[in-house]
Amino acid sequence: MSYMVARMQKMKAGNLGGAFKHNERVFETHSNKDINPSRSHLNYELTDRDRSVSYEKQIKDYVNENKVSNRAIRKDAVLCDEWIITSDKDFFEKLDEEQTRTFFETAKNYFAENYGESNIAYASVHLDESTPHMHMGVVPFENGKLSSKAMFDREELKHIQEDLPRYMSDHGFELERGKLNSEAKHKTVAEFKRAMADMELKEELLEKYHAPPFVDERTGELNNDTEAFWHEKEFADMFEVQSPIRETTNQEKMDWLRKQYQEELKKLESSKKPLEDDLSHLEELLDKKTKEYIKIDSEASERASELSKAEGYINTLENHSKSLEAKIECLESDNLQLEKQKATKLEAKALNESELRELKPKKNFLGKEHYELSPEQFEGLKAEVYRSRTLLHHKDIELEQAKRQVSLRASKNYFTASLERAKEKAKGESIDRLKSEIKRLKNENSILRQQNDKMLGKLRELMPDKAFKNLLSELKAIKPIVNIIKKAIEKSLF
């Protein structure tokens, strides 16, 4: 749970000028490095005071108008008690803008109800520093008299430290009681901020790093035993002696944390050798796989080249087949033309034979029959016989060509069918084998990657960030292997 912080500082006339300039941000440049000028417009005032009037003039006018004495205000009089109201960063991170404003208004109302609404001179809320806080000026004016000692004595300050957190809790803000203001009331603003920083450091060491909150001075042992602490404290308070168990200082917590880190570093050193061995084994395995990938890539390239050559040869044969097909069609056309010519010749021959039948045989003196031909008829007969022989010779040639064409067509059909079967078989076997090999390599690569991720996880837990980043940089050199695998897969599939 967060603490309620309420710290008071007495303000005389000489202090109010600087307080006014600081709270209203009238400086062009700030010596306070905590101020973020880009957020100063988010600051606001919870009273209806005229913000152009200085605190000193406002408070003196108020006192002079309401005092019962005619005496002038002493030059060294405490004109105002400024309260800084805040909590830790974690508390405000859980609140939105409206809830933050309600928190400060509630704190202001507590002082207004207990010390007079008219005595609240200013209530300036700052949101432009590391932690939201309120500077609230309470004029210690009561019964017509100005007296800081009368309004805020030691007992009243203790009462506020007890009562204010309770009041805030009743209004929905769960806060623990802070340190007694009487111990810190004379602190400067810088000292107060250092105290706040120490408080935040303490909470971070306890909550984030789990530093031990208590130390037993009898043994020097650090522990987390809250029950033992309060038991010893109650016993010591009863007999008015100092408890042997006290809260650890921030320095003791940091020393403990440093020791924990040193022990962790020793563990890292002891586990470094096995990790280096594992890493060496992984590097050997990666080297082996790299060689396998290169080999597969080479084989895939060879297979791709063979497939390319086979496809080129197949394309050549297909072109040759198309050429043969065209020749066969041409020969068939020529054969048809020859058949027509043959029929014409047969008709012509039939006519010539008819003429020959008209020739009548004659008998010679021996009584034998013979044909007498005129020179023209003889020459015509010779020519006809020559043409017939020539035609028969051509027909014999054409018949042989036709027989060869029939055989060629059958061979072409057989070759085409065989070629298609060979093509499918070659492609199927090569692609199936390559796919199988690629699948095997993918599985091995997946297993290797899982082992690698597991090892990197262990290294991340055990190694310092810088050493781990250096290791990652070295492992990035293995990335070209991935490119080799991708190329092998692409060449195998396409």
From Swiss-Prot:
Q: Which GO terms describe its biological process?
A: DNA recombination
Query: What is a single molecular function from GO for this protein?
Result: DNA binding
Q: Which residues of the sequence carry a binding annotation for DNA?
A: 44, 115
Keyword Ion transport tagged: no
Q: Which UniProt keywords apply?
A: DNA-binding, Plasmid
**Entries under InterPro entries matching the protein:** Mob_Pre
- Listed Pfam families: Mob_Pre
Q: Which domain of life is it from?
A: Bacteria
Remarks, anything else? Contains conserved positively charged amino acids probably involved in the binding of the pre protein to the RSA site.
Summarizing the function annotation, the protein's role is: The interaction of the RSA site and the PRE protein may not only serves a function in plasmid maintenance, but may also contributes to the distribution of small antibiotic resistance plasmids among Gram-positive bacteria.
Please give the family membership noted in the entry. Belongs to the plasmid mobilization pre family.
Q: What name is this protein filed under?
A: Plasmid recombination enzyme
List the gene name.
pre
